Amino acid sequence: MTSHPANRISITRRTARWSDDDVTIADAMDLWGFAAGAANVIMQLSSPGVGYGVVESTVDSGNLLKHPWKRARTTLSYLAVAILGNAEDRAAFRDAVDTAHRQVRSGPASPVQYNAFDRDLQMWVAACLFVGLEDVYQLLRGQMTDTQAEQFYRSAATLGTTLQVQEQQWPPTRADFDSYWDNACAQVHMDDVVREYLRDLVDLRMINPLLRIPFRPLLKFLTAGFLAPVFRDAVGFGWGRGRQRLFEWLFLAVAFGNRFLPVFIRQGGSYLLLADVRRRVAADKALI
């Protein structure tokens, strides 16, 4: 079984498969993952509870538009801990996130009811992270066999269970995940408030104009390319065959060059972030 075409990106040209070896989600911790970062934020916030939870959050230190680099570090550190870390790393990060999440809940005037401890919302965020990692991995390393896809998926549950998602909540098979994903995507909705917030993000309104002007067109292109039609339509981004071809050719070239990069370059950043988390824990410093 596969997801509905509107709910996943469609790639007609991709690099040849590197190998038939066993795989895990850790193999997806590649430096090129940053290219899909903004798209994944859009995916997550397209669930109304997550969208308003972020837009209305009073946790100023985690505000993406006010502290973009700090927020990026927190998200990337979470991925490093969830995928590469051990049980102690995950417990420490869970405590830090729980402290911040206690302040994130809807108020009387909120148009959507939400609570950051809602396991269904956390499952959605974890699912978006998984889909983003799977998309980037297959663009860089080629399409997985059915067996590899199942291995990859089964190793990814810690994306959710590092926080409040229960093991039994994570769909047991890749086919079950596709069913979950299609049902969840049917609930995608974005109003003007969340849409404007996300457009400000992609327009890089929060960074220095000297960086914004040259990088904004590339970010918009990459973000739209990594969005499935259901999300692209929700946020109002245009796309066409020409852009799709350019996106595919770009990642064919990136994938070719990526083959020659040693693992410590492709994945070293994630291990440095994990080491930083451990250093902060040892020094009793804040993680987020």
Where in this protein do the model-derived segments appear?
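Mature, function-bearing regions of proteins
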Residues: 1-288
